[in-house]
Amino acid sequence: MKRIKNVLIFFLAMVMLGACRDKKSEKKEEENIQQENTFVNPLKTEGAQCWANYYDGWYYYMQEAVDRLELWRTRDITDLEHAEHKVIWIPKDPSNAHHLWGPEIHPIAGKWYVYYAASDDNMDNHQLFVLENSSADPFEGEFELKGRISTDKNNNWAIHPNVFEH
């Protein structure tokens, strides 16, 4: 009985000793490990699924947004964080007004086109869409929805558009 009592006291002492550890240094250690294993984009600290295009002395940049499309431009890509930017499209049609992903801007035949994926708020219904701006400068004029891009007869899930000239 005395042996069980001693083992129990020893066990309780170990539990109490473990509870006295320095949680601040443990948290700091975890943060250091995360910082060592995390890449921070030096050009822009926030933004997913980004796209950059260099045209006529300007860098044009787009990134994912939940409910709108924004465009940045700068002559110095290393100063993207401070670049001029504007909202170029806010969808009004509920079929393409949610989860705007992977926008890309392309100058083609004197016009500007933005390709992106969006849904009707059901993640299974992502489709591709295209906007057009007839202005030579994408910061001038207005982007107009040209429509959904049909990728197949079953309207399967479609994301991450890209175009090329042939």
Name these PLM-found stretches.
Residues 20-166:
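Carbohydrate-active catalytic/glycan-binding domains of CAZyme proteins
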Residues 1-29:
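Bacterial Sec-dependent N-terminal signal peptides
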